[in-house]
């Protein structure tokens, strides 16, 4: 499993510029996001494209996978982002529910060419409400993947926006993991909304053993 790590930064102060001092032992703010949606909507592909800028047909998660990356300084605090891709199969459901704990935001994904995946968005919203301990404070963004399949699109962007507006949820149509269309924007929107609300977890690197002790090593993107 790949993970970006923070390197030690130094401070250089000149007459016109000042760089912020930060090292690996400093506390940071962690934002945890979970990607949800029906099978074959492209959740693993979206995560792979966003983090590694790669695309491979047939990629899927086995149970749970995650990436962690540096986000940067916001209002004097240093942020890291943890994004989880959880398998939506029923046989993994009990496992994946446990990873909802501590989530600050959710990205709900549907397939622009699959009406059922759009219809099931309400199911995933209910999952968050019923299974996430922090659902009242969670931020949600809904995106439609596979917009590159122009001739097969079945979901009207207006209909998608109307649904999201009725739920007070941000919508972001026209995303393609395959063609790398608008991949960064919905993640950035979600992160900004979470940080603006002040929803994050302060982490001390000296005690940050979560990845080493709690991740099932077989749950990787393959």
UniProtKB/Swiss-Prot annotation:
Q: Which SUPFAM superfamilies match?
A: P-loop containing nucleoside triphosphate hydrolases (SSF52540)
Binding positions for GTP?
37-44, 85-89, 145-148
Q: Name one GO cellular component term.
A: plasma membrane
**What kind of membrane protein is this, topologically?**
Lipid-anchor
Biological process terms from the Gene Ontology for this record are: vesicle-mediated transport
Domain of life (superkingdom)? Eukaryota
Q: What InterPro entries does the database record attribute to this sequence?
A: P-loop_NTPase (IPR027417), Rab (IPR050227), Small_GTP-bd (IPR005225), Small_GTPase (IPR001806)
Record motif Effector region, residues: 59-66
- Which residues form the lipid moiety-binding region (S-geranylgeranyl cysteine)? 219
Q: Does the keyword Lipoprotein apply?
A: yes
- Residue ranges annotated as coiled coil are none
Entry keyword Transferase:
no
Q: Which UniProt keywords apply?
A: Cell membrane, GTP-binding, Lipoprotein, Membrane, Methylation, Nucleotide-binding, Prenylation
List the GO molecular function terms.
Answer: GTP binding; GTPase activity
Q: Pfam families, alphabetically? A: Ras
- Positions where Cysteine methyl ester occurs in the chain: 219
Residue span(s) of the pro-peptide: 220-222
Q: Where in the cell is it found?
A: Cell membrane
Q: Which NCBIfam families match?
A: small_GTP
| PANTHER family associated with the record | RAS-RELATED PROTEIN RAB
Q: Which family does the record claim for this protein? A: Belongs to the small GTPase superfamily. Rab family.
Protein name per its UniProtKB record? Ras-related protein RabT1
Which gene is this protein's source? rabT1
